[in-house]
Amino acid sequence: MFLKASCSLLTLVLLGTAIAFADQPKAARSVASRLTTEELARWIDERFAEAWQESKIVSPEVVDDATFMRRTFLDLTGSIPSVSEARDFLEYSSEQRRGALVDRLLNDPRRPEKYAERTAAHWATLWRRMMVPGNSPEAQMAVGLDPWLKEQFTANVPYDELVRKLVTAKNDGQALAVVNPRLGVRNGGPTLFFQAVGGKPETAASSVSRVFLGVRIGCAECHDHPFAAWKQKDFWGMAAFFAGVKNGGIDDSSAAKIRPENGLIDYTAVFLGGEEAKIANGKTSRETLADWMVSENNPLFAATVVNRVWQHLIGRGMTDSVDDLDKASPAERRILDDLAKKFVEAGFDLRWLIAGICKSQLYQRECLVLNDTVTEPPPGLRPIKTLSPEQVFDSLEKALSLPVARADGSARFNGLRDQLISRMNEAASNNPEEFRAGIPQALLLMNGRLTTEATDLDQSRTLRGVLDAPFLDTEAKLLTLYLATFSRPPRAEEKQFLLEHIRKQVDGDKQQQAYAEIFWGLLNSPEFVLEK
């Protein structure tokens, strides 16, 4: 049973401001044929129930409330819940509390700065890392895209409009705005995308095709693709749309012809699939490409974004590789293509898609543990995921009650955030189901500052607040440390063992040190950096 804390200044500082959960009113349909998010969730469950029955797959059990809460906070906001957020949800008795949590995190009109903006910032980071992956100087430059992407996600700009803005971005002649003076990161808006991917027609064509159409044509730059249907003429036909992208800058001319360096042939702009582009008067070649890309009839565009969102939320895409959609079999794409059609009918509404997936029973089922006999989950079954570098640090902020770092470089802990993320990026994988030992090792490397201070009785905000709270007994203190780190109560065996350990300490100082050791162990446990 959860202890109800009395109202005090310490309680508010330690546990944060509470969430007031309530049944959420259903939003009016903005598109006549779109499903509600609850209807979409049921549709997803029905389709996968049929697929699993055909494959004789036994559905995993639905997870408990604590696991769902932690999973949803991590997937939508990029960090674990605070202690107060965890208590509020776990003590909320409505049968609709899971759906209410999803709606609250995606769009709380009463307090957008608390949830919707956090969610938008997290998805901006996800999208930027997807568009410009890795830890190269170019990828670091792309951090300047985050403020612009956050604006798009905060406003819930339809995805087709967002991509159109990126593909048709124009130089506005204004100076770049500084985002992080210490790192020299600048905000160039959507034009920065082309600079970050190399600033040349061929790099732009390769990146746009992979990111937004789910196909990799880069291997066809110099020769026909050895494992796919793409020919060299397909690659340069796409590159011709970006003939005005040179040396990191953008020329808004309607140029639609290109000759490779040291080449003998001019290539004109051709859509993937072989149809020659006709550039209308008054339009640039990139505007013509954007019209084709975001068309409701394009079989790759909507399916690619649905597959990417699915990979983030479930842990793996509906196809083997989200960047090789063209290689997927019709059987693999059956549910994906049908879901993509519904996404189009919903007006390319990303918030609608995310909510529908998170409200489904499929999203709420237990992870499948991989072993020697099960090397990869069947479609729709989620693996255990590792947290991204940003998720690890932002979760540490929550667990340790640190001042929240900000992208403008003004917060005390931004240097530590950058250092931790940089180290973890060296060990992290773009595939969220791949766990690497480098992540807990990176945490250990940071013990000199973060986790050591966090478990120091004189410096730790969370630990000091728990130990000094007069209204928390031994059991409640242990519970609070678990909520702060694992977002769940201790299991019966954990509780029994740790309470016995605490109560064995003969004096107050040793008992306080026992709490510090427990907190250190929780922070450095693999469970802290895994999403189950």
Language model segments and positions:
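Structured secondary-structure scaffolds
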Residues: I279-T284, T288-F301, V305-L313
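Boundary at the C-terminal end of the N-terminal hydrophobic targeting segment
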Residues: A20-A22
